[in-house]
């Protein structure tokens, strides 16, 4: 009955996901130094241990061990420990353990902080391609939290989440667009215009191609929110501009086109 048990299935799926996600980058990590006949700065056994702790839900153990590598002068430039930190914090943020959530009350933000550091350390993009699924889950949770703050008109708090989103991917037009819109709401007009300009240039250059599904969802939300916001202020020209700029993606989207017709 193992495979008929939803809880067991979920655990199995998570185990397989993490295993597939981490196996390749860790192998590459070891090979990177093996080519030069040098011992790796971080032993493969340590990564295996971190992986097993992730699978077993021992997230605090992951944090305690991985953070040592992020703070040690010899290993702090290595990207992989940062993504372990990020994943552990993210799983804590999703936990139903109230004591754990109270202890790590900023777990989602910490997950974003270490994910951002991972991206910066992975300058050659050697590892990031192996963590696409994780980053998409992180984006989704971040987008949801930011939307809550937007709905509550807590724009300064929302701003920090959208900033993390474009830090994870500087070519994410939806993140830049929403970052600009919450800055606009916070009366930071100049910064808002700069962020909007970045979003516009990305849409002109790429037309929304190559975005992950969650990034497309963010862009749709950003376009609708920004267009309606500008329309409410009487700026119909710019409101239409943003919807038309994403026509390649949302030209047949009923919700987006309904907003356009209302302008």
Language-model features: locations:
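Structural register within alpha-helical repeat arrays
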Residues: 49, 85, 92, 138, ...
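Start-of-domain marker
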Residues: 31-103
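Terminal, low-structured helical/coil segments at or just beyond the last alpha-helical repeat
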Residues: 33-35, 214-217, 222-263
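TPR alpha-solenoid repeat register
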Residues: 79-81, 175, 209-210, 222, ...
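Short coil/linker segments at helix-helix boundaries
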Residues: 76, 87-140, 202-221
